[in-house]
């Protein structure tokens, strides 16, 4: 698997970003302000992520998604390891990520990669998404869990 910086977003990139975040306006905003990386296997797109500096020594992993057919193969874990290394080499001291409070697999993955929970942003998904309800694991998604890791 290779991970490389994306210079120009394609429709395939955009569709994969929307898999993790269905708000096109938010995706467009942070993809333009951040750095987008793609993961490929045999020149086929299998994953994507966006890193966005948020404060002088802090960067956030604002989106990470793996093509559904390639999920469960450790791709996201390798991408997160790449993000941690890239952030550290770029001089950042902290990396943050936010995810849905009922995204059990995501919460497990981030903690497995060394992130620790630091806050809950109550009603984040209610405030920022036009869809009346986002259902995940059979529950209505309302809150965002914020996690961070010192580099």
Where are these regions (language model features)?
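Conserved beta-strand-loop-alpha-helix junction that forms the acyl-donor binding cleft
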Residues: 97-107, 122-128
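Conserved active-site tyrosine of GNAT-family acetyltransferases
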Residues: 109-110, 115
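Conserved GNAT acetyl-CoA-binding A-motif
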Residues: 87-99
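Short hydrophobic/aromatic beta-strand or adjacent loop that forms the aromatic wall/cage
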Residues: 34, 141-146
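Acetyl-CoA-dependent GNAT
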Residues: 3-69, 80-81, 150
């Amino acid at each position: 698997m290779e991970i490389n910086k994306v210079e120009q977003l394609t429709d395939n990139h955009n569709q994969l970003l929307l898999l993790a975040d269905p708000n096109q306006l938010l995706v467009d905003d942070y993809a333009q302000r951040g750095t987008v990386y793609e993961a490929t296997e045999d020149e086929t797109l299998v994953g994507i992520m966006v890193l966005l500096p948020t404060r002088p020594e802090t960067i956030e992993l604002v989106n990470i998604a793996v093509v559904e057919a390639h999920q469960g193969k450790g791709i996201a874990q390798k991408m997160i390891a790449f993000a941690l290394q890239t952030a550290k080499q770029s001089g950042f001291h902290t990396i943050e990520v936010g995810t849905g409070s009922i995204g059990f697999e995501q919460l497990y993955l981030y903690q497995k990669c060394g992130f620790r929970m630091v806050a809950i942003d109550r009603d984040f998904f209610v405030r920022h998404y036009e869809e009346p309800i986002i259902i995940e694991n059979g529950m209505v998604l309302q809150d965002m869990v914020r996690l961070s890791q010192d580099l």
